[in-house]
């Protein structure tokens, strides 16, 4: 088999409350919204949020959602945050907005672009989301 994977197009995640998910990913984290009108017109089963050209499809469902394993990792531009103190300030802003931040955060972690400060938070469905400096 001769397959040449060149990039990631999207990841789909089920959400129990689309408005709460958009408040988290768009309003709090600043991700661009795409396909909302197409969703509302019934053309697609999701609303996308976008970071760096990569899409997360938020797929509303009434079925139970299992978020007990895995996580999403979103890169935060390091030009805006370069120190532990700055990511601590971000954590306080997220907590003030009602976002659950895991105990013991922030922490330096390795990722696709090396080691840097990161924090694990939970989205409205309890899904683990890593915000990692880049």
Whereabouts are the PLM-identified features?
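Active-site beta-strand termini and strand-to-loop segments that position acidic
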Residues: 49-52, 121-124, 134
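N-terminal beta-strand motif that seeds the catalytic metal site of vicinal oxygen chelate
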Residues: 1-19, 72
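Core segments of cupin and vicinal oxygen chelate
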Residues: 14-56
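Short acidic/glycine-enriched loop/turn segments that link adjacent beta-strands
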Residues: 40-45, 66, 112-115
